[in-house]
Amino acid sequence: MSSTPKQTTGDALAGHTPMMQQYLRLKAEAGPLLLFYRMGDFYEMFYEDAERAARLLNLTLTKRGNSNGTPIPMAGIPVHAMEQYLARLVALGESVAICEQIGDPAAAKGPVERRIVRIVTPGTLTDEALLPAKADRALAAVCVTGKREPRAGLAWLNLASGAFHVTECAPAQLESELHRIAPAELIQAESAELHMAFEGARTRVPDWHFEADGARAQLLAHFKTDSLGGFDVEDMPAAVCAAGALLRYAARTQSQALAHVQTIAAERSGQYVLLDPVTRRNLELTQTLSGEESPTLFSLLDGCRTPMGSRLLRRWLHHPLRENEPVLARQHAIATMLTARQEGEQTFAAAGLLETLRDALNAFPDIERIAARVALRSVRPRELASLRDALAALPALHASLTPLSGSPRARELAAQLAMPPDIGELLARAVASEPAVAIRDGGVIAAGFDSELDELRALATDGGDFLVQLEARERERTGIGNLRVEFNRVHGFYIEVTKGQTDKVPEDYRRRQTLKNAERYITPELKTWEDRVLSAQDRSLAREKWLYEQLLDALAQYVRPLSQCASALAELDTLAALAEHARRHDWVAPELIDGAEIDIEAGRHPVVERAIERFTPNGCRLDQTRRMLLITGPNMGGKSTYMRQVALIALLARTGSFVPATRARVGRLDRIFTRIGAADDLAGGRSTFMMEMTEAAAILAASTPASLVLMDEIGRGTSTYDGLALAWAIAYRLLTHNRALTLFATHYFELTRLPAEQPTAANVHLAAAESAGGIVFLHEVREGPASRSYGIQVAQRAGVPAAVIRQASRELERLEAQGAPTPQLGLFAAALDADVQSQAMTEQAEDAAALAQLRDQLVAIDPDSLTPREALDALYRLKQHLT
């Protein structure tokens, strides 16, 4: 590999060409980042950067001569294709420094002036082409402070929208919080040791970035204030440190202040229903268990008409609310949108109001991200055109909201849509109806906006009459009937004469280009006119660029109202999508109460019911008198689906959505836990059973009477007795100590005796029936325990060979004839005295120790070396040990 020269000062650069000296200085500034070095129509990379980029992007690796006596490896990409290459590099976890030409090549005596204008990292993407439309890509920073009582401060910024949040938690909760936020990049101090799983990119910055005084000063300077009291973060010192470091890093990547970041939102621990990473995965909120994006709860509900709405819906699903008031505000807004609901019925008629609202939302682009790019001065001309058209569509949207005035939240959102009329008028006057893709192409500023630009454009483009007249005069003057006056980008304007007519060319014709069948000439008159036209084109483009910068300056004052408008549009879109789904699929508004309770009548799994022809609805009741359901039944009977169904209905209710049921009542929940299925964590060195116990331990440690807990087949990864003992003990602990609302599925039928001892537990089962053709799963939840598990019948349906099925059936009959082993049945007998249990365990331990000692004595005996007398003595000693 060719290493980049590291010394960038003094004599170390003397042997390099001036251009390479400039490159090496900029590369030293970029550090380990890939440096895209602008040279004309290409971004070039040299030395290790070239070799790395060639490998990652499959580019051709060439050489750019020698500098300081050594060859220079080089690879490049076209400027117009930069975004697609950037996307590939960011997807690979790379960060890129982009160096642009900012000087005038014509005026430069040496290398044209260049500087790094921005840094692109996985967490600082703002370009539309690099961002996922329906998901956020946040940049996060973490800081752990305190030794006796450590606290983890977490800050995260969505640079593409300007949303800036902070929170604090215990260090043990940090991994769960990061999973909730799902940042693309995490910033941490160089010396920080964070032992946690994180799939995104990690970036280390100097420790002093996280120092309290410097971080606070960074925030105060950015928000132009003397105190952080107005942001409600004064009691979050660790979060303030993280926020200051994050803001410093983000501003450096953009090479400018972040004008669209205008506030900090402090999140408190009691704000949301907490979902740990296992629960988010098991409930398949936005990703299936196999890692696919569909079918998930999000893909099912996402009927949003704007990308902003889709992103907000995703955030709502990952952040269900704990308090009822904001949930009821959303729910009431959805109900108001469904004004065509027929009284006393569970179905919805066609809602013309809702369709009108959703049609109006179709007219809106991603204003949230456009506003951010306006602030960052990276907005493209066509985005401004789409913003202009969107502002023109606001009155129609306002009109469609008038019937929703009965909803306080809808009224608030309608008021938030109001925009100053000046911005719409400015964009309508300034931006061409169909602008070019980039400002460098011209044609962006509308005709009539600037008289000087109009004059330059006329001079540059209205030369058609002159060329026609010149061609006619030259034909008459030379007698060459097929003479033509034309233009191309390489040679400019020229007069073309065929080879057979060149003897008629006048003396004032100067040859410009020779072709196979023609010669091309220039005359003094045509040259003078060409200079004037090309100069006008250059001046026109320069004027247009200047006007575009002035336009961005004028738009900067509207970033805040644009962001507020985008936020209102996103929420209206999300509410309308949820309302439309409720209307189409017979969902109902759940009743929200203060106590911890879940009461569902004829509930349905929102995703599964759309995937099968007929879904069997089931109810569920969990409250103060019925805190645990012990669920038994056959494999494939629907236990896991039923449990997920209950959790998803509860989660939907806490987001403000309607739910798939005929009636539902859901109380205030603080957490939702799931332990449904498991797989080996090979990378972490943990078996399935270890994973299962780790998840169970987390649930037992953190669940409360306001938690919903789903436990599926706990204890199955070990021996029967161990598994049964653990399952019983875990269920008993959840019921009597944690007192969480629990769905506990099991194949250990001994556990069905628990309700006899603890009245707040109840047995239910998934029904099945046997027929001549085998087992039939009814998928109905019925009261009471199951009578059997039908494991052999399920194996038969799975295609296990008939001989194996017959042998298994015979073995089952033999085991059933023997009856259940006494120790297993008696293991949890309520009348069993605790002292007897303790004595039995002590005796077992003593027996085990004696057997171990006996084994050691036997191993120590070498029969070949013993005399008959010694052998007889050894035998007596062993007999004495046994008796």
Curated annotation (Swiss-Prot):
Pfam families reported for this sequence: MutS_I, MutS_II, MutS_III, MutS_IV, MutS_V
Family: Belongs to the DNA mismatch repair MutS family.
Primary role: This protein is involved in the repair of mismatches in DNA. It is possible that it carries out the mismatch recognition step. This protein has a weak ATPase activity.
GO cellular component, as recorded: cytosol
Protein name: DNA mismatch repair protein MutS
Biological processes annotated in GO: mismatch repair
Key words of the record: ATP-binding, DNA damage, DNA repair, DNA-binding, Nucleotide-binding
Top-level taxonomic group: Bacteria
Organism: Bordetella pertussis (strain Tohama I / ATCC BAA-589 / NCTC 13251)
